[in-house]
């Protein structure tokens, strides 16, 4: 939300933690997403509630020439906007959004946050994904995000819950996301 507010770019979340921009807003092939930021968090729990939260955020702000193998999957805010970006504004708005959502969770309204995550993560419904199990690669169609944050994936008549591993979005040669 901080990137959306500070830049006007309609970024999305690609489950679980990538901030991406649909190619309709850039010069890529239709249906691709370019990563502009990533979020990692850890919330150790004792009992029902987290005792602390550690959050790491990386935002690609400056224009960058990416290696050929990344150029269709990575981008930056300045590249997308074709103008300089006020880094302080991106930081302030991102921290303000984190503060707002921390308050929502603190007040016991986790479902509100989960619903917003789902709204900002359209690829979590109806997208092809491939992931590895111990036995083999599996493929399915995303079927939403569970109340505990797991990605539901429909495989025929079964629904799998993904909580960790490596996911390829789209065709098997698509974007890989480490969980």
Q: What are these model-derived regions, one by one?
A:
Residues 1-179:
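Catalytic beta-strand/loop module used to bind and position nucleotide/cofactor moieties
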